[in-house]
From Swiss-Prot:
Alphabetical list of CDD domains matching this protein: YajQ_like (cd11740)
Entry coiled-coil feature ranges: none
GO molecular function terms attached to this record: nucleotide binding
Lineage of the species this protein comes from: Bacteria, Pseudomonadati, Pseudomonadota, Gammaproteobacteria, Pseudomonadales
Physiological role: Nucleotide-binding protein.
Disulfide links within the chain: none
SUPFAM superfamilies: YajQ-like
Protein name per its UniProtKB record: Nucleotide-binding protein PA14_57130
Keywords: Nucleotide-binding
Length: 159
């Protein structure tokens, strides 16, 4: 039976490249020079600036560099800014994997449309199986059309 997996993966190399490009762009910006910094740790980035409006500009720089490197900005989880001495800091975490709630929502969407496919939750991915390839492509089109708050990829398509 044909099947495919619905996953949400983050390319860590592209993420580090985007953060490095954002750091280079910060060095070139005259209004932010020497006052702001990005610190990357695994799947989180800490933004440090002197004022809140600078944090907003830094977030825009980070988003634009993520888009240039083809990393979906929907996986960003932006936390509230907090003061730390004379500077203001903000954490940005990058989510990866499909959590239980999103997996249930995906399965519910597929069942709600009464497509001729079955969806099963397998850890951090959802396996969709069906009798025909066309049914699977219909399910892919359905999931691409929905905005679920996380970027989805479709892998392991088997005939």
């Amino acid at each position: 039976m044909p099947s495919f997996d619905v996953v949400s993966e983050l390319d860590k190399h592209e993420l580090t490249n985007a953060v490095d490009n954002a750091i280079k762009e910060l060095d070139r910006r005259f209004d932010l020079k020497g006052k702001c910094s990005f610190e990357a740790k695994d799947k989180s980035v800490t933004l440090t600036a002197e004022a809140d409006f600078m944090l907003e500009q830094m977030l825009d720089i980070l988003r634009s560099n993520l888009v240039k490197r083809k990393v979906d900005s929907q996986c960003m989880e932006i936390k509230d800014a907090y003061p730390s001495g004379k500077v203001v800091k903000q954490e940005v975490n990058f989510r990866e994997g499909i959590d239980k709630d999103l997996a249930k929502k995906i399965v519910g969407l597929i069942k709600e449309r009464k497509l001729k496919v079955q969806a099963a939750i397998q850890g951090e991915q959802v396996r969709v199986t069906g009798k025909k390839r066309d049914d699977l492509q219909e399910a892919i089109a359905l999931l691409r059309g929905e905005s679920l708050g996380m970027p989805l990829q479709f892998t392991n398509f088997r005939d």
